[in-house]
């Protein structure tokens, strides 16, 4: 839009030891692209609880991965349910906030203007659609996404953000209101190992015992806990909380 204030929370996608000030986005140019497209659309609304879930998409890669991945899963499941080519439907998501709360909208619409009404026709069998979507997301053994579950040549441009496990977390929240459980201690150890050598260069030693992980510097020692990116960041004295998504996909944010 024309409001420059929307850029104030957009940070540099990298860290520099020479530049300490925030980016002012003074050279940005507003460009609006769009066209009228009349078609049928199905929208699924997921209400989020900001007390439990980090609802800020600019800093939470989980929210973007979960929304995009669940949208792709719903499209593939809908095409199987309707026995049509997946090119007949287009999918996407948006995160919105208003006085009523925070929401993720997953939408499906026909790829052709004034199409055959596929997107709306699936509304009558929404329960079967969600069940089939769950089967698709749970029926794979990959770590995030592959060509056996969510990836195909039409969505190559978003392959890097597809994550069937994040999609399952969002689907579980929508159906039961349950958050993903805490990261098991063994997995926390595994994820933190990727930072061990980097931290040693800065003079920080990672101490792992049977119950917890500690980061020890020259002047202080703090407990380190890896938490699910879906969660609102916990707060606890003398404890550093690190998102598991940052350790997997964006280590520079974890440091």
Residue spans for each PLM region:
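Elongated scaffolding segments in large macromolecular assemblies
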Residues: 101, 219-221, 253
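Short, flexible coil/linker elements and helix-boundary hinge sites characteristic
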Residues: 83, 200-203, 254
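Active-site metal-binding core of divalent-cation-utilizing nuclease and nuclease-like domains
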Residues: 194-238
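Extended, highly charged accessory segments
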Residues: 1-198
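Basic, glycine-rich
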Residues: 237-255
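Structural motif
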Residues: 47, 111, 226-232, 242-246
């Amino acid at each position: 839009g024309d409001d420059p204030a929307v850029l104030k929370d957009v940070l540099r996608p990298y860290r520099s030891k020479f530049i300490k000030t925030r980016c002012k986005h003074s050279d940005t140019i507003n460009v609006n692209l769009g066209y009228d497209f009349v078609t049928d659309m199905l929208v699924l609304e997921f209400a989020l609880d900001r007390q439990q879930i980090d609802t800020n998409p600019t800093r939470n890669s989980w929210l973007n991965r979960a929304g995009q991945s669940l949208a792709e899963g719903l499209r593939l499941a809908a095409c199987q349910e309707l026995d049509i080519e997946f090119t007949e439907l287009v999918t996407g998501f948006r995160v919105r906030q208003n006085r009523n709360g925070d929401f993720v909208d997953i939408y499906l619409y026909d790829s052709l203007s004034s199409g055959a009404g596929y997107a709306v026709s699936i509304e009558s069998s929404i329960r079967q659609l969600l069940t089939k979507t769950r089967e698709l997301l749970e029926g794979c053994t990959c770590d995030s996404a592959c060509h056996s579950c969510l990836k195909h040549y039409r969505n190559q441009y978003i392959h890097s953000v597809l994550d069937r496990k994040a999609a399952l977390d969002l689907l579980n929240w929508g159906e039961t209101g349950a958050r993903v459980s805490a990261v098991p201690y063994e997995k926390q150890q595994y994820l933190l190992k990727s930072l061990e050598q980097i931290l040693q260069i800065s003079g920080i030693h990672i101490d792992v015992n049977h119950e917890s992980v500690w980061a020890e510097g020259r002047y202080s020692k703090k407990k380190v806990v890896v938490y699910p990116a879906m969660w609102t960041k916990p707060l606890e004295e003398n404890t550093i909380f690190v998102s598991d998504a940052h350790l997997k996909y964006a280590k520079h944010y974890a440091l």
